Amino acid sequence: MVSKMIIENFEALKSWLSKTLEPICDADPSALAKYVLALVKKDKSEKELKALCIDQLDVFLQKETQIFVEKLFDAVNTKSYLPPPEQPSSGSLKVEFFPHQEKDIKKEEITKEEEREKKFSRRLNHSPPQSSSRYRENRSRDERKKDDRSRKRDYDRNPPRRDSYRDRYNRRRGRSRSYSRSRSRSWSKERLRERDRDRSRTRSRSRTRSRERDLVKPKYDLDRTDPLENNYTPVSSVPSISSGHYPVPTLSSTITVIAPTHHGNNTTESWSEFHEDQVDHNSYVRPPMPKKRCRDYDEKGFCMRGDMCPFDHGSDPVVVEDVNLPGMLPFPAQPPVVEGPPPPGLPPPPPILTPPPVNLRPPVPPPGPLPPSLPPVTGPPPPLPPLQPSGMDAPPNSATSSVPTVVTTGIHHQPPPAPPSLFTADTYDTDGYNPEAPSITNTSRPMYRHRVHAQRPNLIGLTSGDMDLPPREKPPNKSSMRIVVDSESRKRTIGSGEPGVPTKKTWFDKPNFNRTNSPGFQKKVQFGNENTKLELRKVPPELNNISKLNEHFSRFGTLVNLQVAYNGDPEGALIQFATYEEAKKAISSTEAVLNNRFIKVYWHREGSTQQLQTTSPKVMQPLVQQPILPVVKQSVKERLGPVPSSTIEPAEAQSASSDLPQNVTKLSVKDRLGFVSKPSVSATEKVLSTSTGLTKTVYNPAALKAAQKTLLVSTSAVDNNEAQKKKQEALKLQQDVRKRKQEILEKHIETQKMLISKLEKNKTMKSEDKAEIMKTLEVLTKNITKLKDEVKAASPGRCLPKSIKTKTQMQKELLDTELDLYKKMQAGEEVTELRRKYTELQLEAAKRGILSSGRGRGIHSRGRGAVHGRGRGRGRGRGVPGHAVVDHRPRALEISAFTESDREDLLPHFAQYGEIEDCQIDDSSLHAVITFKTRAEAEAAAVHGARFKGQDLKLAWNKPVTNISAVETEEVEPDEEEFQEESLVDDSLLQDDDEEEEDNESRSWRR
């Protein structure tokens, strides 16, 4: 054993390490020295220890690691770290610290224990220099040296107890009551009065000082193992009783932030202890340097090193106790509540059952009793009668912690029996893996260990805990108020102790928690290779259906049984695989179930149904424990509570299905499956063929209906999407066919025009050629007519879905498209598709008359011989009744001589003259054919629409090509010309006629 064979004096080596590490390391030299000491103490060979030290210290020392390790082992082997036997400089140092005591202090040879004693007295008496009380105290100490040496050696061998620290703190609190005197005078006189009152107390105080030499080490000391020295609780000291202290059960995973009520008077004594403890007890002692400000204290509000910090914390420091996490976040301080009236300047203690102040973050659960399974992790061993054996066994009025603490991981010792009347068995968490707060190290630690033999593998060890516990009914103790904040609870934002706020399900509520009534902690239940069932929790109701779960879990293996709404919980499910390997594969998968990371998967445990129901917050109705097998044959109402066990075989389930309600339930399951089964199988067989264990499951009807609706909606949504896609494909195909037909039609028309012009120009053509051309024209005419009919037949179908829109919707869509087009054009983006859509909308709007300008009344009814209905007959009817006229004249205008940029605006331009029935624009030849609803509208467009954007368009009537002779054509043309001249009548004249009629009508109405 390298550590015991070579190292003779751990304290001397630690001092040597601190001095050596200080110039080469940014970390705290004292803490790192203890870490190095813990590494060197390991039971390994020198070679292994060197490798271990180099590996572990590389992160701290980096380039200096190798040199330092070699230097360390040389010092250990040569014992050069040991100080010289005498300390000639200590006397001069003492004179420098206490100039007023120079004449009175005896100059004698001092042993190592005497040096420590003097160092401690200097530490306590450093800040307020009052010579008289210190002189008397040092005199009395010198007289007691011989008596105390043996006791000191005993205390050095045995682990120190926490009551000495509490003693000093209580005395400090007692001294702090006087605010009217100066800090130093009050401190000295109180000390003098106490010693004069009780000499035995002074003697015991000297014993405790030797122990405090070890207690003032940093709290993250790596070889610290005794839980008794981890924490202390300041409790009020009653003036007449000096020994009534009670230990408080606190744990290594908690932080205690204490702001004492005597801030003003404890400044220097509590924060000036580090300097001399850090220097060696021998020739390495240096005179004190002026302290710099502590950066951690200024930035965070408190310092993790506490009394051990070498830097200045100011005049009002906050005492931080029991911290094993150096990187802890800042936490507001809270003064402890004392018995009796509070000191001046502080508010009275809070009333019983008052939650912690609002400014404490995160809030702490309300006070309550500790569980019977909590081991006594603090308190001195039994031989001391004035102290309670543990905070758990203390009487109700003792100064125990008013806030429940949590249990550290890995404690396997049995606690002493606790009074069963004070505690309940179901209030505390157990040891287990918490995925939300994993422990860095999972190594088990015994409850009581000797300091010398302690070894830790890591620099910093964290323990897991969960403070989200249900509210307690136990009132807090009046004598102390202690704020204990768990390291995990820093992440919480809602305290579970607040009324009306639901508490988070604690770890013991999880399905795989082994809830036995054993007082100790149970090991995690190891599931055997025969378990094939998985439980799902927190499944959203919309996802908790058979089809979704089957889709996800069938990838891992064969599903034997699948139950949703398991255990009456709409968010629960049970899945059974054919083999254990498949189930393990499913539970080990890193993929989130159904893409939802909140869904939890656990191993299913037989017989845990009743326990889960008692702890599950979702099952609101009380459940009676009863045999599981007969539940299947109960009525539907009864079966809505506990779920039948999944151990029933399908044959038993079929025999139980003779009940009518059971069949009804199975029918609903069939509906829930969406008729997945084959139609040739009966209802019962359908259920069994889909999922073997479905007949064993009792469902909540409300959950079934909701899930069935969700399934139907999702199925219909999928069908709608597919139908929409098919519809779009069909429309696209139809448009392509129509476009192709349109192209063929245009080619035929061009050919027809060419042949007609050929006939007209060549008057001297032979009769044979003329006959051939006429035959070709006939064929072309038939084809053109046929193609036109096909195109027209396809056109209404294309516009049918859009014709449902109202006029307002059409206008809104047109305006929106126009705005989008304008924005994209301004931004310089591609607008071809948007322009095409805009043109189609314009065409549709023009066909429905939405784009017409509405110039005057009756613009659509001003035809030849139009009847006004008032018997006046003012239209140019030529003596023929309007309803008897069949107008076969063309209503389509052929438009040309426009540019590519004008093509989009052409349709709106002509739409203002009337309702457009059809519009065909040839992109290649810049030729358009617009068909109006009536001849009059077409004539108005021909007269007024020829001028477009400052240029003249070429307009011509688009006549349907028929096999007519030139004579008939000549007869038609004068009629058109005549009507064109007639239609040139100004619209204002017609408008005047209308106004005249309105006047007559109004006068006749008045008569």
From Swiss-Prot:
Residues 532-606, 891-960 form the RRM domain. One of its GO terms (molecular function) is zinc ion binding. InterPro entries: Nucleotide-bd_a/b_plait_sf, PWI_dom, RBD_domain_sf, RBM26-like_RRM2, RBM26/27, RBM26_RRM1, RRM_dom, Znf_CCCH. Residues 334-388 have a biased composition (Pro residues). Residues 169-186, 857-877 have a biased composition (Basic residues). Residues 719-795, 823-847 form a coiled coil. This is RNA-binding protein 26.
